[in-house]
Curated annotation (Swiss-Prot):
Keywords: Activator, Cytoplasm, Developmental protein, Nucleus, Phosphoprotein, Transcription, Transcription regulation. It comes from Arabidopsis thaliana. It is found in: Nucleus; Cytoplasm. The gene is FHY1. This is Protein FAR-RED ELONGATED HYPOCOTYL 1. InterPro entries: FHY1. The lineage of its organism: Eukaryota, Viridiplantae, Streptophyta, Embryophyta, Tracheophyta.
């Protein structure tokens, strides 16, 4: 296989104006080389190895045709005299090692701490706390709260419930009493929307 050649001219890799770039054609599995112009401000992948751990994971995984080695060191610099196949192997192993490092970081004891902190909150929401935490008076209030509310509503009577309902627009109340239905004409839905949107336009 042809080797990647880069003219160093005693310059740092980030100061090189051009380098050879590989393209892998997935349909033919052929390696091609192109010369790519790079500004002096850009960095090579080897210069970015420290920054790669801070970036989010890439959306693509290792190439299917290239074996991903867990024993290779992805942070080592790539020698410019390697062949193109070794370049592909090293770049894919860097991606795989970053994936493995991120998975190891995410599976720590922090997850357990978060589960414990949310457990008491979820118990409070769904009412699955231990009954030992409550006094007897609090338990009676919780159990009989619904019954007390129903008794109070029955004592007030249905007529005092005010048979007025507010429409979804929130502006007009509709009486459900039979005597008031004959006095006022209820607007249609179209009229209600016209009135509502006309007030919004003002």
């Amino acid at each position: 296989m042809p080797e990647v050649e880069v003219d160093n001219n005693n310059e740092k890799p980030s100061e090189i104006n051009s380098f050879h770039h590989m393209i892998i054609s997935s349909s033919k599995n052929v390696l091609k080389m192109e010369e790519v112009e790079v500004s002096k401000k850009r960095k090579f992948q080897t210069d970015q190895s420290d920054e790669l751990s801070l970036l989010p994971l890439s959306k693509h995984t290792c190439f299917a045709n290239v074996a991903c080695s867990e024993n290779t060191n992805g942070n080592s610099e790539i020698d410019t005299e390697y062949s193109m196949s070794s370049y592909v192997n090293s770049t894919t192993s860097m991606e795989c090692n970053n994936d493995i490092e991120m998975k190891e970081e995410s599976s720590g004891s922090c997850g357990e701490d978060k589960m414990i902190s949310f457990e008491s909150h979820l118990d409070y929401i769904y009412g699955t706390q231990n009954l030992e935490d409550f006094s007897e008076k609090v338990i009676e209030n919780i159990l009989y709260l619904d019954e007390q509310e129903e008794e109070e509503e029955d004592a007030k009577g249905c007529s005092s419930n005010a048979a007025k309902f507010v429409l979804s627009s929130g502006r007009w109340t509709v009486n459900q009493d039979d005597s008031t239905l004959h006095e006022t004409k209820k607007p249609t839905i179209d009229q209600e929307f016209e009135q509502y949107f006309s007030t919004l336009m003002l």
